[in-house]
């Protein structure tokens, strides 16, 4: 049997009202919105981006875009698991966030479609640690957060997951089909 350790004793977690008044909680909620939006915007549009940029079939677009994104996202988590004792999580997440910005710029402004597609894959590598890392940092930053904190942070992340792809679609449509403008 493996014991399950609790961060907070039953009934000892912060209430929703206490969380709402906690600036650290709001910082993490913002991080979750950004993590969800940056992850899902690229992963949801990677297939269409690959199809339109590389002029390949839907099947090839699905393989080239989302598969590369997902594989590199998994690699990011495996790399952090392997080197977590050598690299502090806030440093890794900061590097990942900067890499995410770079990957979006690469995807949107890459002069070559293959280079732009590599930006999509690089985005997977960059966002892989953001969501799980933010949970770990939130646990340390709000040690009494409890179940309500985790639920609200997941909700913030889900809001980002919905808003990110929608925003890409709206901007792309406004730019008359310019997917690069949306990204």
Over which residues does each language-model region extend?
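Transmembrane alpha-helical cores of Major Facilitator Superfamily
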Residues: 33, 67-71, 98, 151-159
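A late C-terminal transmembrane helix in Major Facilitator Superfamily
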Residues: 144-177
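Extracytoplasmic gate region of multi-pass secondary transporters
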Residues: 22-67, 71-74
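Interfacial helix-cap and linker-helix signal at transmembrane-aqueous boundaries
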Residues: 50-51, 83-84, 139, 168-177
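Structural signature of the two symmetry-related core transmembrane helices
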Residues: 91-106
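Intracellular juxtamembrane helix-capping segments at the cytosolic ends
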Residues: 128-142
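Juxtamembrane intracellular "pre-TM" segments in multi-pass secondary transporters
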Residues: 2-28
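Paired small-residue
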Residues: 103, 114-122
